[in-house]
């Protein structure tokens, strides 16, 4: 375990030096900003080290790029995995924003597990999230997970806030899925969010895919009670590694 932690620390430093090559697109931030959960670490064969990533089109401009280095120890059903990553947008004009870098350490035992993720976006915020996952159903085609999460966040201006909650996540082997999330930000209110995703096309090797996604969220308490936010996106992605 100590070797995995040491590897994470070393690689975070390496990715930090590469961060300037992947500028991130600007975000609109009408409320407290919190990004979607980071992409879960992929599961690899025991003791295999893998460099991978993805490139996804962005209708707002540029492409969203991600680079990650993962190391797993164990079997596909029972393992510990460490990952370091950097993510941003390739667009540099008219405005570019810092690249988000981070590290994840996860444990999985037949679909049940724990995950710790630390992220840093210079000039924007720092976050530390803990997630517990329990697999409720999996028959090889349909999968249903229950998750509980807690995160501690600090914005660049020094403002700190927590975000805690639970979620149900359904996924289909063909790439379709839906997620229902209930979150609480103490002192600000509670939110209910429903997200859906559909795979419209994928290459034979499944490395290139066209996906449609949508989200709808509503504040159920606090000063923003009743306010809703809707979003949708269509993206072409290519995965490597």
From Swiss-Prot:
**Signal sequence residues:** 1-21
Superkingdom, taxonomy of origin: Eukaryota
Chain positions with Phosphoserine modification: 127
Q: What is the induction comment?
A: By bacterial infection (at protein level). Detected within 24 hours of bacterial infection.
Residue numbers carrying Pyrrolidone carboxylic acid: 24
Q: Which UniProt keywords apply?
A: Antibiotic, Antimicrobial, Glycoprotein, Immunity, Innate immunity, Phosphoprotein, Pyrrolidone carboxylic acid, Secreted, Signal
Give me the residues of the propeptide, which is removed upon maturation: 22-23
Regarding tissue, the record states: Hemolymph (at protein level).
**Compartments where found:** Secreted
Q: What is any one of the record's Gene Ontology cellular component terms?
A: extracellular region
Q: Indicate the principal place this protein occupies in or around the cell.
A: secreted
Single GO biological process annotation from the record: antibacterial humoral response
Q: Which Pfam families match?
A: Attacin_C, Attacin_N
According to the UniProt entry, the coiled-coil residues are none
Q: Which residues are glycosylated?
A: 39
**In the UniProt entry for this protein, what further remark is given in the free-text comments?**
Not induced by bacterial challenge in imd mutant flies. Level of induction reduced by over 90% in 18w mutant flies. Toll loss-of-function mutation has no effect on induction by a mixture of E.coli and M.luteus; but strongly reduces induction by E.cloacae.
Q: Which family does it belong to?
A: Belongs to the attacin/sarcotoxin-2 family.
Stated role: Has antimicrobial activity in synergy with other peptides. Strongest activity observed against E.cloacae.
Q: What is this protein called?
A: Attacin-C
Species of origin reads Drosophila melanogaster
């Amino acid at each position: 375990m100590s070797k995995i932690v040491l590897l994470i620390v070393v690689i975070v430093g390496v990715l930090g030096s590469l961060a300037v090559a992947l500028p991130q697109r600007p975000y609109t931030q009408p409320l407290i900003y919190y990004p979607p959960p980071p992409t879960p670490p992929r599961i690899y064969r025991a003791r295999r080290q893998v460099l991978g990533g993805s490139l996804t089109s962005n209708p707002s401009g540029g492409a969203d790029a991600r680079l990650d280095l993962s190391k797993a120890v164990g079997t596909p059903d029972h393992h510990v995995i460490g990952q370091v990553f950097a993510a941003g947008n390739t667009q540099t004009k008219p405005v570019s924003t810092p690249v988000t870098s981070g590290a994840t350490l996860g444990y999985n035992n037949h679909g049940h597990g724990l995950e710790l993720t630390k992220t840093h976006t210079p000039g924007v915020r720092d976050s530390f999230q803990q997630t517990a996952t329990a697999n409720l159903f999996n028959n090889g085609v349909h999968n249903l997970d229950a998750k509980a999460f807690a995160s501690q966040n600090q914005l660049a201006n020094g403002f700190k806030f927590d975000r805690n909650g639970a979620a149900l996540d359904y996924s289909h082997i063909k790439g379709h899925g839906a997620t229902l999330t209930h979150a609480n930000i103490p002192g600000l209110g509670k939110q209910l969010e429903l997200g859906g995703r559909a795979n419209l096309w994928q290459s034979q090797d499944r490395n290139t895919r066209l996906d449609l996604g949508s989200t709808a969220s509503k504040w159920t308490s606090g000063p923003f009670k009743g306010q809703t936010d809707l979003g949708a996106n269509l993206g072409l992605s290519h995965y490597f590694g």
